[in-house]
Amino acid sequence: MRTLWIVAVLLLGVEGSLVQFEMMIIKVAKRSGLFWYGAYGCYCGWGGQGRPQDATDRCCFVHDCCYGKATDCNPKTVSYTYSVKNGEIICEDDDPCKKQVCECDRVAAVCFRDNIPSYNNNYKRFPAENCREEPEPC
């Protein structure tokens, strides 16, 4: 219960896509994005640098690249509409920005689900100083 309260406090003031992304991860990967991926490897969490450490970290790298390609919108705050049908996420907006951000989040959530076996606790709260290699291009 205390953990749920902490997560609720952390989400206060956060709008749009980040909250929706968290809910999407929970629905698809059956785990909390904040808890499992909030500070993982070199790319999961705020910012990102260096090279992804494993397949899970690569999910975050690709997500960061996808957000970076979103045009004429702020991916972290835009709200979008999606549904879940037969366990699959369907992005429903016609607006190009909302659709693109939803697709970025959908691909990342599926990537997390598909790469649960690669998750390595050694990369949780991974020190940024270990992420100094030359980054690969998006």
Swiss-Prot record:
Its EC number is 3.1.1.4. This is Acidic phospholipase A2 Cvv-E6f. Gene3D superfamilies: Phospholipase A2 domain (1.20.90.10). GO terms for biological process: arachidonate secretion; lipid catabolic process; negative regulation of T cell proliferation; phospholipid metabolic process. Its cofactor is Ca(2+). It comes from Crotalus viridis viridis. It comes from the Eukaryota. Disulfide bonds join C42-C131, C44-C60, C59-C111, C65-C138, C66-C104, C73-C97, C91-C102. InterPro entries: PLipase_A2 (IPR001211), PLipase_A2_Asp_AS (IPR033112), PLipase_A2_dom (IPR016090), PLipase_A2_dom_sf (IPR036444), PLipase_A2_His_AS (IPR033113). Keywords: Calcium, Disulfide bond, Hemostasis impairing toxin, Hydrolase, Lipid degradation, Lipid metabolism, Metal-binding, Platelet aggregation inhibiting toxin, Secreted, Signal, Toxin. Belongs to the phospholipase A2 family. Group II subfamily. D49 sub-subfamily. Residues 1-16 form the signal peptide. It is found in: Secreted. The active site is at H63, D105.
